[in-house]
Curated annotation (Swiss-Prot):
This is Putative regulatory protein CLL_A1210. It comes from the Bacteria. PANTHER family: REGULATORY PROTEIN SSL2874-RELATED (PTHR38449:SF1), REGULATORY PROTEIN TM_1690-RELATED (PTHR38449). Pfam families: RemA-like. Belongs to the RemA family. It comes from Clostridium botulinum (strain Eklund 17B / Type B).
Amino acid sequence: MGIKLINIGFGNIVSANRLVAIVSPESAPIKRIIQEARDRGMLIDATYGRRTRAVIITDSDHVILSAVQPETVAHRLSTKDEVVDEVDE
């Protein structure tokens, strides 16, 4: 099984194997998840100061903020063209 990496915007790359969910930041429960992650020190802000459009939740309980739409991240996850690298273990 290889490690799949996906671009989440501005040159930031995340391991696709570790993703649990890609969601929109608009709802109150997601805003609470973001605040709780910030309080625990588990929040990664990859927006470069831009508006948060996608919230990525990983299996390690890290919460990653991205300025790319959730649909775009999901599309990059599902296509081979946007996979940055595959490494065989």
